[in-house]
Amino acid sequence: MKKQESVLVGPSIMGADLTCLGVEAKKLEQAGSDFIHIDIMDGHFVPNLTFGPGIIAAINRSTDLFLEVHAMIYNPFEFIESFVRSGADRIIVHFEASEDIKELLSYIKKCGVQAGLAFSPDTSIEFLPSFLPFCDVVVLMSVYPGFTGQSFLPNTIEKIAFARHAIKTLGLKDSCLIEVDGGIDQQSAPLCRDAGADILVTASYLFEADSLAMEDKILLLRGENYGVK
């Protein structure tokens, strides 16, 4: 087993107190989050509704953190420009949501932000390598998209290893990162790091009230010691 390495941690704002998103964004910043992950759901691609460009803009006004917008929507082309205007720094679209993936990823980059491609748990990643040159990040969903609080899907680990091998083979180690989204906690994070993940997105684990402070949970997810002053 390879040595665990520190990763980037991005809390999903969907798990926060939605009545005070500005305050929550500031708390995430102060706790040492690397970025904020914003889930956009349209009620069709996934069976839930969440935010729109106005919420992205409000969060952007509340924090200096990098904003990652995860578009779990059909017809993503229609919304890219509004997401960018609202303050998105990276936009993730789903492989299952469009037939023109390469064109979509290229368009996102043309708009001046980073582009990511997400794969839902039941989608084969057999053809992932052909899309990697167009991506700044590839997102492997480790829960079914739509709701927080789900358990980590163990078969994600072999997907991470597959993606890591493909990125290395294509010589994209410095330009394409692997992100794992869903069910990330103290148990699943080390497995993801060991398999080759670069970025972890977490929600329930980070926001649930227990004896650990938020900043300590972030350090644990990164694989770093906490409680040392």
UniProtKB/Swiss-Prot annotation:
A divalent metal cation binds at residues 37, 39, 70, 181. Pfam families: Ribul_P_3_epim. The keyword Lipid biosynthesis does not apply. GO terms for biological process: pentose catabolic process; pentose-phosphate shunt. CDD domains: RPE. It catalyses: D-ribulose 5-phosphate = D-xylulose 5-phosphate. Pathway: Carbohydrate degradation. Its cofactor is a divalent metal cation. Its EC number is 5.1.3.1. The keyword Cell cycle does not apply. One of its GO terms (molecular function) is D-ribulose-phosphate 3-epimerase activity. InterPro entries: Aldolase_TIM, Ribul_P_3_epim, Ribul_P_3_epim-like, RibuloseP-bd_barrel. It is an enzyme of class 5 (isomerase). Binds 1 divalent metal cation per subunit. PROSITE patterns: RIBUL_P_3_EPIMER_1 (PS01085), RIBUL_P_3_EPIMER_2 (PS01086). Substrate binds at residues 12, 70, 146-149, 181-183, 203-204. Keywords: Carbohydrate metabolism, Isomerase, Metal-binding. The active site is at residues 39, 181. Gene3D superfamilies: Aldolase class I. NCBIfam families: PRK05581.1-4, rpe. HAMAP family: RPE. Belongs to the ribulose-phosphate 3-epimerase family. Catalyzes the reversible epimerization of D-ribulose 5-phosphate to D-xylulose 5-phosphate. This is Ribulose-phosphate 3-epimerase.
